[in-house]
């Protein structure tokens, strides 16, 4: 056995050499002539985490919209109170091509099982949809250390579109997001702890902020029983920003069960929370090229 291969006890293994993948972004033509969609990305675990999130929310079916510039995943949680919209911009991946705008329907449980078998040995995922096999979506995973390629063929359908779900995309348009009066950031741990603790005492919590440089205030009060107040006094520590005029008060009541289930499902370390005047909440996080938005409707209370 050569000296390069033999290792003494306790000595760490040789450092893995990771290929340098160029991110070319959007292509004018596909690499494979039969492709209607081609998506190549050097971070397969992002998809694994996304489908773990869908699993945690007990989502069933997932709509996939492919456009010439991006791919977007739409789904609902089990309670139907939250809507998930996850987008990957084609310019941020190794290469991306979609011939036109089209929709695919995939079963979450089927795809989830596939991603369960994917670990860090796989450094690239390629997704292909072909003109000659419209009922099939190809997932190709590559392990460059041993030059292994694993290909899954998943049956897809032309879905019945959930227009209420798709309409939720307007809530996260660039123009709409500018007008949200209150936003801040929590770690996933803080979000989970806050709403888990609150759930022991009450079903509703009030989120409140006065205009100007004032703390974020979460509280509940039960008549002749118990009250609780949670104040965030340093806006910079939670990246708190607001457009609330000094003479006004922003206040909404939120159903804790909806937020608690989301907090338990989160797969990112940091979450940006945006509040709309009608009480709707947006939970926004990022994983490399993926932008993950979850919209929770206050009128579902």
Curated annotation (Swiss-Prot):
Keywords: Host-virus interaction, Inhibition of host innate immune response by virus, Inhibition of host IRF3 by virus, Inhibition of host RLR pathway by virus, Late protein, Viral immunoevasion. GO terms for biological process: symbiont-mediated suppression of host cytoplasmic pattern recognition receptor signaling pathway via inhibition of IRF3 activity. Disulfide bonds: none annotated. The keyword Transit peptide does not apply. Induction: Expressed in the late phase of the viral replicative cycle. Belongs to the asfivirus E301R family. Interacts with host IRF3. Plays a role in the inhibition of host innate immune system by acting as a negatively regulator of type I interferon production. Mechanistically, interacts with and prevents host IRF3 nuclear localization to inhibit its transcriptional activity. This is Uncharacterized protein E301R. It comes from African swine fever virus (isolate Pig/Kenya/KEN-50/1950).
